[in-house]
Amino acid sequence: MTTSPTAPVALVTGAAKRLGSSIAEALHAEGYTVCLHYHRSAADASTLAATLNARRPNSAITVQADLSNVATASFSETDGSVPVTLFSRCSALVDACYMHWGRCDVLVNNASSFYPTPLLRKDAGEGGSSVGDKESLEVAAADLFGSNAIAPYFLIKAFAQRVADTRAEQRGTSYSIVNMVDAMTSQPLLGYTMYTMAKEALEGLTRSAALELASLQIRVNGVSPGLSVLPDDMPFSVQEDYRRKVPLYQRNSSAEEVSDVVIFLCSPKAKYITGTCIKVDGGYSLTRA
């Protein structure tokens, strides 16, 4: 089977592994052509693209960009271009979809840095230890807010500008943006204050962008998973404490359960839904410690 020239196109950030790869595969299975963004996981992204292209030729590409550090992030593509600003790097991701397929119908803002920044721990700049592998809380702030809030804002802006510019040619096209928020905006994990702040900003962006972009028939929604496919370095004690608080099944959400909601929000069945955030957390956000 080959990709139809009219197949809808989805840009998924952080698509190389874990939840992002599951979302990308689910969209591909629904007939989407996918642009797989990655930061450091080049091998994983290439493997996923090869798998998807084997199923349907010319249905997946990979594009690398650092969306996390506002001040120093880099960007590389095969042509060697190096846009400097975060907005230009975000625009380049959207442009890649148009260069390859002439359209971009869906944007999934999934890329995310995630680690604790305890308020009572001294960072390196205060004579204490570093925050994760970061040298200071200032760098952590640029990283966490860059990937979780600022880059999504710029990606939405670039996406919407392209829609506005091509509206006449793409008349009748349905557009959808899905922001991957977090159930922690309702009940934070201890020590993850800065991450929670950034995800709160993303949830606010979801509502504000939905209002502003409705005139272009761009729907903007959020999905708030609980802990799903976890990073390798998350302490087991944190995972166990989380699962203990989940009313439904006392477990993490699966990648497939989260991806199913993303697919729904991108589908015609959700054509009258915008500005909402759906929790996929087994009721975690309803509980208190």
Swiss-Prot record:
The active site is at Y195 (proton acceptor). It comes from the Eukaryota. One of its GO terms (biological process) is tetrahydrobiopterin biosynthetic process. InterPro entries: NAD(P)-bd_dom_sf (IPR036291), Pteridine_reductase (IPR014058), Sc_DH/Rdtase_CS (IPR020904), SDR_fam (IPR002347). Gene3D superfamilies: NAD(P)-binding Rossmann-like Domain. Keywords: Methotrexate resistance, NADP, Oxidoreductase. The keyword NADP applies. It catalyses: (6R)-L-erythro-5,6,7,8-tetrahydrobiopterin + 2 NADP(+) = L-erythro-biopterin + 2 NADPH + 2 H(+). Its EC number is 1.5.1.33. Substrate binds at S176. Pathway: Cofactor biosynthesis; tetrahydrobiopterin biosynthesis; tetrahydrobiopterin from biopterin: step 1/1. NADP(+) binds at residues 14-41, 195-199. Exhibits a NADPH-dependent biopterin reductase activity. Has good activity with folate and significant activity with dihydrofolate and dihydrobiopterin, but not with quinonoid dihydrobiopterin. Confers resistance to methotrexate (MTX). This is Pteridine reductase 1. It comes from Leishmania tarentolae. The lineage of its organism: Eukaryota, Discoba, Euglenozoa, Kinetoplastea, Metakinetoplastina.
